Structure formats: structure tokens, C-alpha cells
């Protein structure tokens, strides 16, 4: 009797272990989204606080948090800096663990107003949840004074979705304002600007070369500040205009138009045509400048301010490009600061010439035209950045490749005129850089390497519950595998790249009907399908037998490598 009881216990333990090993291996370890990311909120008058308690082993994506007010106006929330996170498919991002509190200022809320909060997260084990949306009822709040003052300018967060992260246009622009300083210094060495510095220096000093070094430095600095004032004002005006038309400036047709303008500005730097103010206006501004008295702080400052309005053919294109660039940001600080640093960069060589004389200036020559051409390539980087938003990442990579090949190819050809021996090493570097930049174009024209063009499973796409029922009915006695996929699911992409492409997996699935549902949009049909299948998150792969019934303990949640998945298939489909 004791022997039989012991045998039954061993059989039970063996069956339990087998189910744990080959069955629904990950389904029990993942909790519903409400438990993984417990959401709560509190409102006190104008201050609303959104709280998340994040279960250990789970995290929220910073860039996936959005708020959408209805019958209310809220200030754009500022999320705290998250923990750096990187994966193969989505690159660098920021995540939150443990707990998160986000303060939101409610500027105005009518009775019955609500705030929809959308968020998304994953488990560290490679399991991602669909975007979750919670509706927060808002207590009625009277408009603040700032809202009343700006009633003519609706808040960006009024009645439209606001993504509360650093993905605003100002944050995603490719260059920081510091680059404007370097661009200004570079423009100073173009053929239209550099030869003018000795003349401008003499005008600033009022023809008196007996001034002390301190006095000369002061006058030169004042002149540069006058020029910087004009440029800063231009930056503020353009950034403010960009702020008023922020949404329009992000539409595809505007981005394409701006890109075309940037290309024209670059062509002017290549010498195809001359771009400058009308001669009559330049003459009038020059006469105004000549009436100022050099050698005096007030007169020098006025000359600098007027000089900021007189654009030479070499400065018009870079200045126009920077102005259009900061209009994309709608950021007043960025607009004013960028143009100030640009003017400061142009003024630094003038300060050196005024204080130390012409001996610090390099000799004029063809190299100045090459500097001007190089800035044409810098301007061409801006349309590539803008078009990348419209055309998508693959075409963006190809455009960057074309620009890189063009720049390094031009630099290589230009360097062939050099006679110094050390330039041979530079030529090798330039040629190598051009070849590296050409790689995306080679892959596009001649096809990706064979190793990357692996055969993938031929899925039949379904979108609704009815599609699933029809596909199961038409399976004709074959087993069915349903793969639930979404673009925001990292492990789904890992399945696609590493598991489904493996020969042993494809052999194990031979004879099975392969279905796939893309639930990226999280639409009503997607939600209904996930609810019907009782799916918490992705990746989830479900197996059905020849009668259309789900195979017990066959469901896979979380990533599986090819050998483990092939073993699972043999145990469930055979």
C-alpha cells in the first residue's frame, strides 16, 4: 500500500514538473497591467498628481506617457529624468522603476472635465503590455491669471494629446546652440567676411591706433555685442513666430518645403547663385553705419547693431538656415541663444584683429572658398534631418549616406591639390570615410548580405475575432499557430529575427497554419481580440489543435530562443 502511494506521489510530481517545463512557461509569472503599474491620482485645486507604483521586475517607458485633457486646459507636464535603457530594436530610451509621480498643473477645468492618461511598460523578462489608458475625472477649476492673459493663444495641451517627454521639436533638433558658435567662427573665415576684418577694425577704433589694449578690447567687444543684439532679436522673433505655428511647422508638406529652401541656401554656398539683401537697402544701412562715430562706445555699438542687418553673400545662407532651423523649435531661449552665439562666433576673429592686429589673420587664398563650400554641406544636413521625419528611418539612413559620400568625396578631391606629404594620410582617411558612408547605399542597391536575408515564416494576417474564427474553421484539420505581434514589443521583434528564422523552427512548423495579428494600433478590434484570447501582453503565441481548440499548456509568453521553441513545438504539435 505504501509503495502504491509513493508511486502516485512520484507520478504527480513528474506530471507537474513536465507541465512547468514544457507548458505555459511564462503565463503565470506575469501579472495584469493594473498590478504591474498600479495607477492613482490626487487633485488639490490647480495641482494634479499622477502616481504609479511599479512592481519589481517591471518598468514604464518615459516616452510612452501621454495626457489628453477634455474640457480642460493643463500645462505640459515635465517628467523627471528616467533611467537610461537601450535595446537592439528601439535604441536608447528612458524608463521608470519602482515608483513615479508626475505633477500636472490644471490651468482650467469645466464641470465634468477629464484627463486621459496613456502609458505603457514591460517586464524585464521580455514581456510588454499594450498601451493602457486611464480616465481621470477633474474637479472644476477656474482659469488662472496666466490662462486669462493668454486666452487668445490656446494651450498646447488643450483638447489634444500631449506627449510629456523630451520629444518636442526643440529637444529633437540635431544640433545644440553651441554649434552656432562654431558655425559663426567658420563663417568668419569665408571670402566675403575675413578680408573685411582689418577695415572694420580700423573703423571701430576710429582710426586711432594709439589706443591702449584694454580700450581696443572694450570697443571691439561692444561692437560684437551690438551685432549680437540684432541677431538675438531676430532669433527671438523667429522662435516666437515658430511657437505660434508649431503644429503647422511639423506637417509633412511644410517640412518638405523647408527642406527645399535649405537646399537652395546650400546651393548659394556652392556658388550657383548669389543671395544677399537688395543693393539699395544695403547702401542705406551702410550710410547709417558711416554716420556713427568710431572710437566711442555708443557709436561702435550702433555700428555693430546695423552691421547685423547687412548680410554678405557668404553670411545670408547660413543665417537664413539657422533662422528656419530655430523656427522649428518654437523655443525662445534656444532662438535667442543660438543667434547670440552665432554672432559671438563671427565676432571673435574681429576682437583678435582689433587687439593684436592683422598678424593673427591667415593669408587669403582659395581655402576661403573651400570653407564656404563646406558650410554648404553643413546646411544640407538640415533638410536630411527634416525629411527623415517624413520618409522614415530607412530613407533617412540613405539620405545621410548620400550626404556623407558627397562631403567626403568633395573633401578628397579638394585635398588632391595639396602638395604636403602629410596630406596623403588625410586623403586615405577621407576616402575610407566616403566608403563607409556608402555602405547603406550598397545594401539598398545591391541587396542586403545573404546572412541578413533569411527566410521568414509566411504568416496569414488576421485583424478581428471574426477573422480568427474563419481561419480556424478553414484550417482543414491542421494545427494552427497564432502569433500576436506589435511594433512596440521588443521580444516580438526578437522572435521574428532570431527564432522564426531558424531552420529547426521552420521544419517543426511544417504543415501548420500560421496566423499573425498585428495589434500595434491597440484599436477596438485589437482590444476585442486580446480580450477574447485572454492575453495580458506580448509576445504571446497561441496554438490550436485540428479541431480549432486551444492546446492546453501550449501558450508561449515571453521570448524563447530557437532551440527551446523548436522543442516546445515538437511537444505540442506532434
Curated annotation (Swiss-Prot):
Subcellular location: Cell inner membrane
EC number: 1.8.1.8
Keywords of this entry: Cell inner membrane, Cell membrane, Cytochrome c-type biogenesis, Disulfide bond, Electron transport, Membrane, NAD, Oxidoreductase, Redox-active center, Signal, Transmembrane, Transmembrane helix, Transport
GO molecular function ontology, one term from the record: electron transfer activity
Domain Thioredoxin, residue spans: 430-574
Biased composition (Polar residues): 152-169
Gene Ontology BP annotations: cell redox homeostasis; cytochrome complex assembly
InterPro entries given in the database record: Cyt_c_assmbl_TM_dom (IPR003834), DsbD_gamma (IPR035671), DsbDN (IPR028250), DsbDN_sf (IPR036929), Thiol_diS_interchange_DbsD (IPR022910), Thioredoxin-like_sf (IPR036249), Thioredoxin_CS (IPR017937), Thioredoxin_domain (IPR013766)
Matching CDD domains: DsbDgamma (cd02953)
Spans annotated as Disordered: 147-169
Catalysed reactions listed for this entry: [protein]-dithiol + NAD(+) = [protein]-disulfide + NADH + H(+); [protein]-dithiol + NADP(+) = [protein]-disulfide + NADPH + H(+)
Known role: Required to facilitate the formation of correct disulfide bonds in some periplasmic proteins and for the assembly of the periplasmic c-type cytochromes. Acts by transferring electrons from cytoplasmic thioredoxin to the periplasm. This transfer involves a cascade of disulfide bond formation and reduction steps.
Protein name: Thiol:disulfide interchange protein DsbD
Originating species: Cronobacter sakazakii (strain ATCC BAA-894) (Enterobacter sakazakii)
Source species taxonomy: Bacteria, Pseudomonadati, Pseudomonadota, Gammaproteobacteria, Enterobacterales
Amino acid at each position: 500500500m505504501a509503495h502504491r502511494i509513493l508511486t502516485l506521489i512520484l507520478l504527480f510530481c513528474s506530471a507537474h514538473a513536465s507541465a512547468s517545463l514544457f507548458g505555459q512557461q511564462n503565463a503565470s509569472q506575469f501579472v495584469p497591467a493594473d498590478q504591474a503599474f498600479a495607477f492613482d491620482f490626487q487633485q488639490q485645486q490647480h495641482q494634479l498628481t499622477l502616481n504609479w507604483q511599479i512592481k519589481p521586475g517591471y518598468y514604464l517607458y518615459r516616452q510612452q506617457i501621454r495626457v489628453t485633457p477634455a474640457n480642460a486646459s493643463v500645462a505640459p507636464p515635465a517628467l523627471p529624468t528616467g533611467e537610461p535603457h537601450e535595446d537592439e530594436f528601439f535604441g536608447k530610451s528612458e524608463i521608470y522603476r519602482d515608483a513615479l509621480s508626475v505633477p500636472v498643473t490644471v490651468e482650467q477645468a469645466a464641470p465634468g472635465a477629464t484627463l486621459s492618461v496613456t502609458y505603457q511598460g514591460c517586464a524585464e523578462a521580455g514581456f510588454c503590455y499594450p498601451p493602457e489608458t486611464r480616465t481621470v475625472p477633474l474637479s472644476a477649476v477656474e482659469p488662472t491669471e496666466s490662462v486669462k492673459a493668454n486666452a487668445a493663444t490656446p494651450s498646447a495641451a488643450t483638447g489634444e494629446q500631449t506627449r510629456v517627454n523630451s520629444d518636442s521639436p526643440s529637444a529633437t533638433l540635431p544640433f545644440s546652440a553651441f554649434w552656432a558658435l562654431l558655425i559663426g567662427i567658420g563663417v568668419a573665415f569665408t571670402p566675403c567676411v575675413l578680408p573685411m576684418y582689418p577695415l572694420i577694425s580700423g573703423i571701430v577704433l576710429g582710426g586711432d591706433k594709439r589706443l591702449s589694449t584694454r580700450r581696443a578690447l572694450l570697443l571691439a567687444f561692444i561692437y560684437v555685442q551690438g551685432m549680437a543684439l540684432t541677431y538675438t532679436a531676430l532669433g527671438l522673433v523667429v522662435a516666437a513666430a515658430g511657437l505660434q505655428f508649431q503644429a503647422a511647422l511639423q506637417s509633412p508638406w511644410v517640412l518638405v518645403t523647408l527642406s527645399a529652401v535649405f537646399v537652395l541656401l546650400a546651393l548659394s554656398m556652392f556658388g550657383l547663385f548669389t543671395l544677399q539683401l537688395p543693393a539699395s537697402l544695403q547702401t542705406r544701412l551702410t550710410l547709417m553705419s558711416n554716420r556713427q562715430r568710431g572710437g566711442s562706445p555708443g557709436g561702435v555699438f550702433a555700428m555693430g547693431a546695423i552691421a547685423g542687418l547687412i548680410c554678405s553673400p557668404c553670411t545670408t545662407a547660413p543665417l537664413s538656415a539657422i533662422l528656419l532651423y530655430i523656427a522649428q523649435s518654437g523655443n525662445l531661449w534656444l532662438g535667442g541663444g543660438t543667434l547670440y552665439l552665432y554672432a559671438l562666433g563671427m565676432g571673435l576673429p574681429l576682437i583678435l584683429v582689433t587687439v593684436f592686429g592683422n598678424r593673427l589673420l591667415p593669408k587669403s587664398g582659395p581655402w576661403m572658398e573651400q570653407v564656404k563650400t563646406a558650410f554648404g554641406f553643413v546646411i544640407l544636413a538640415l533638410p536630411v534631418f527634416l525629411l527623415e521625419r517624413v520618409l522614415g528611418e530607412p530613407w533617412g539612413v540613405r539620405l545621410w549616406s548620400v550626404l556623407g559620400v558627397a562631403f567626403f568625396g568633395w573633401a578628397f578631391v579638394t585635398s588632391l591639390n595639396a602638395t604636403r606629404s602629410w596630406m596623403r594620410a588625410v586623403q586615405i582617411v577621407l576616402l575610407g570615410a566616403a566608403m563607409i558612408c556608402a555602405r547603406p547605399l550598397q545594401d539598398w542597391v545591391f541587396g542586403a548580405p545573404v546572412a541578413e536575408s533569411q527566410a521568414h515564416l509566411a504568416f496569414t494576417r488576421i485583424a478581428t475575432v471574426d477573422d480568427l474564427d474563419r481561419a480556424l474553421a478553414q484550417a482543414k484539420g491542421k494545427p494552427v499557430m497564432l502569433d500576436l505581434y506589435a511594433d512596440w514589443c521588443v521580444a516580438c521583434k526578437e522572435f521574428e529575427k532570431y527564432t522564426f528564422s531558424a531552420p529547426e523552427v521552420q521544419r517543426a512548423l511544417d504543415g501548420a497554419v500560421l496566423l499573425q495579428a498585428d495589434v500595434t494600433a491597440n484599436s477596438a478590434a485589437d482590444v476585442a481580440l486580446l480580450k477574447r484570447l485572454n492575453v495580458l501582453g506580448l509576445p504571446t503565441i497561441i496554438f490550436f489543435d485540428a479541431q480549432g481548440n486551444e492546446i492546453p499548456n501550449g501558450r508561449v509568453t515571453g521570448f524563447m530562443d530557437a532551440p527551446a521553441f523548436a522543442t516546445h513545438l515538437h511537444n505540442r504539435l506532434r
